[in-house]
């Protein structure tokens, strides 16, 4: 699974991005910038997205507590991650996760 295989690299990328500019995402019309972004932060983005998708799958399986924990991992551990959207821009893992976390959830 993506999460297991790339967590260590994603954590290092998250730490580096937190020190530089967590909000940075490339202009969608710059292929070179997008390619560089994916090369430098690919694991961070993929692992953050995987935690969100895992949460959605767990919700569908009727496991709301496990789903909330997965959303929490995405938001709190991969705060700086982004998901490329079909419109050419990026969605923030943090913002998407925050919309899915229930107000009663507390980060363990």
Give residue ranges: language-model regions.
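Residue signature of alpha-solenoid helical repeat architecture, marking inter-repeat boundaries
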Residues: 40, 45-47, 87-88, 92
């Amino acid at each position: 699974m993506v999460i297991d295989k790339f967590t260590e690299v994603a954590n290092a990328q998250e730490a580096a991005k937190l020190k530089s500019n967590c909000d940075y995402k490339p202009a969608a019309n710059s292929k070179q910038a997008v390619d560089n972004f994916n090369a430098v932060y690919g694991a961070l983005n993929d692992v953050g997205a995987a935690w969100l998708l895992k949460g959605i799958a767990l919700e569908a399986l009727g496991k709301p507590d496990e789903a909330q924990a997965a959303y929490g991992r995405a938001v709190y551990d991969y705060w700086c991650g982004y998901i490329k959207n079909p419109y050419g821009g990026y969605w923030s893992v943090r913002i998407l996760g925050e919309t899915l976390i229930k107000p009663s959830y507390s980060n363990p």
